[in-house]
From Swiss-Prot:
Name recorded for this polypeptide: 4-hydroxy-tetrahydrodipicolinate reductase
Ligand binding ((S)-2,3,4,5-tetrahydrodipicolinate): H156, G165, T166
The organism of origin for this protein: Actinobacillus pleuropneumoniae serotype 5b (strain L20)
Residues annotated as binding NAD(+): G9, A10, G11, G12, R13, M14, E35, G98, T99, T100, A122, S123, N124, Y125
PROSITE patterns named in the record: DAPB (PS01298)
HAMAP family in the record: DapB
Keyword Cell wall biogenesis/degradation: no
MF-aspect GO terms: 4-hydroxy-tetrahydrodipicolinate reductase; NAD binding; NADP binding; oxidoreductase activity, acting on CH or CH2 groups, NAD or NADP as acceptor
Subcellular location as annotated: Cytoplasm
Enzyme Commission numbers on file: 1.17.1.8
Task of the protein: Catalyzes the conversion of 4-hydroxy-tetrahydrodipicolinate (HTPA) to tetrahydrodipicolinate.
Record keywords: Amino-acid biosynthesis, Cytoplasm, Diaminopimelate biosynthesis, Lysine biosynthesis, NAD, NADP, Oxidoreductase
Positions with a binding annotation for NADP(+): R36
BP GO annotations: diaminopimelate biosynthetic process; lysine biosynthetic process via diaminopimelate
Length: 269
């Protein structure tokens, strides 16, 4: 049976890539596409907006107007995603969430919703980035206690949250491995006379410039040597294809909260 996908934010950069990814994938089809109220794209064919030709799916501004989907893929903003979660819980729809920038209350709302529906919630849907998460855990076990750890990330000028969700996830994987709390050990800004660096800090640096899709590098730096683990994305299709892969994997799950580590079966590495 063909899995039907709904996409919110269909007219955005990521939304257009998601439409293309669904169209190219086997075993799935686009069932619904949505944009914010007042968007000039409402009523347009989703495929034409994505530049792949007509799909017969018109963009709507209300999830209640088109429930012809099994899984909703959401790469929007926290306030919108939280409303979409309520709809999916009420209507028994599964979700793939790529939105970043949630506060603790937002994350708890996702956790609560996952008691009733199945959700994949990840900061990054790239296969490569999720492999990097595991490599960081390995490096932290070997070098984390005596090295300075810094996370450097760069994204396009339009990204609204900083550090990126992926950078924070990298820090969380490292902190958990080392038995540290990122909230107390993370350093997100340095300016002026800061004093010497504390050994147990996990530092973050953010770049916003041009059209950078996404670049992340983690340093494990000691005196005399430095190990760098890095990932660079050159196309949003990497994330879109990963999200569709997650949706297909999620189709067999009735409820629960998962991430790409589960989807890719990386827990045993």
């Amino acid at each position: 049976m063909t899995l039907k996908i709904g996409i919110v934010g269909a007219g955005g950069r990521m939304g257009r890539n998601l439409i293309t990814a669904v169209q190219n994938a086997e075993g799935v089809e686009l069932g619904a596409a949505f944009e914010r109220k007042g968007s000039s794209l409402v009523g347009a064919d989703a495929g034409e907006v994505a530049g792949i030709g007509a799909t017969g799916v018109k963009i709507s501004d209300d999830l209640n107007q088109n429930t012809n989907f099994d899984v909703l893929i959401d790469f929007t903003r926290p306030e919108g995603t939280l409303e979409h979660i309520k709809f999916c819980v009420a209507n028994g729809k599964k979700m793939v969430i790529g939105t970043t920038g949630f506060d603790d209350a937002g994350k708890q709302a996702i956790q609560t919703a996952a008691e009733q529906i199945s959700i994949v919630f990840a900061s990054n849907y790239s296969v490569g980035v999720n492999l990097v998460f595991k490599l960081l855990e390995k490096a932290a076990k070997v070098m984390g206690d005596y090295c300075d750890i810094e996370v450097i990330e760069a994204h396009h000028r339009h990204k609204v949250d900083a550090p990126s969700g992926t950078a924070l996830s990298m820090g969380e994987h490292i902190a958990k491995t080392l038995g540290r709390d990122l909230k107390t050990h993370g350093v997100f800004a340095r300016e002026g006379i800061t004093g010497e660096r504390k050994r147990d800090e996990i530092g973050f640096a953010t770049i916003r410039a041009g059209d950078v899709v996404g670049e992340h590098s983690v340093w494990f730096a000691d005196e005399g040597e430095r190990v760098e683990i890095a990932h660079k994305a050159s196309s949003r299709m990497t994330f879109a294809n990963g999200a569709v892969r997650a949706a297909k994997w999620l189709n067999t799950k009735q409820n629960g909260l998962f991430d790409m580590t589960d989807v890719l079966d990386l827990n045993n590495l």
